[in-house]
Amino acid sequence: SLISLGFKLYLVDFSIPVNSDNLDYTLNAIAHTNGDFSQSSHRGMGWSLFVSIFFGFIDSENFIDYSNTIRSLSIGVATFSIPMMYLVGRKFFDARYSLLLSSLFAFEPHLNYNSGFGLSEPLFHLAIIGSFYFISNKNTRFVIISLFLAGIAYWIRINGVFVFIVITVIYFITLRRSPNLFRNYGLGVVLFLLVISPVLLERNEEFG
């Protein structure tokens, strides 16, 4: 993780402000700190909400401070995802192959390059990895946590709804003979709907 962190930091230019999509996330996070929670028609607000927590501690008129904060958070989340990927690997492989899996994830060039842009991908990936980690447990109760994280993925990116679909398919294929199969899945679905309902209600109010 530390070596991968070094690569990520090496690829980032902290001397220039964010622009393009990461600019939108930064401006939205600043708006959230000022009480504006309006949504984009094509972009989730989970990442900007997460960033706004940290922006609340910044009192600066220099936009570069906000730019570098969102970059640092993105890098931090991406780095934290590496040991999570190892834990997912351990559900299927021994320690050696799990380490290989996490290393491939840690040093994938595209992921390292994008992690320093301040985009939503690292947090989205972490939510997906966490969701798969819990669904790979043999106890059906963990589907509740898995679907909760699927709801978080939807907050981060609208296409995160596909995480819910994939988790559902995996759940019924791998745990179909388990006791309390439908009860725990039903609880997970209720929690998933509770998590995403604020997004759905707000989007319906804003965009119809």
Report the location of each language-model feature.
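Transmembrane helix irregularities
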Residues: 14, 76, 92-93, 107, ...
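Extracytoplasmic catalytic/substrate-binding loops of multi-pass membrane glycan-assembly enzymes
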Residues: 14-26, 38-54, 61-64, 68, ...
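Transmembrane-embedded, aromatic-rich helix segments that form part
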Residues: 144-146, 159-174
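Short helix- or helix-capping micro-motifs
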Residues: 3-7, 101-109, 133, 150-154, ...
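Membrane-lumen/periplasm interface segments of specific transmembrane helices
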Residues: 7-8, 183-208
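Membrane-interface transmembrane helices that cradle and orient dolichyl/undecaprenyl
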Residues: 90-93, 131-145, 153, 173-177
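Transmembrane-helix motifs of polytopic, lipid-linked glycan transferases
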Residues: 72-92, 130
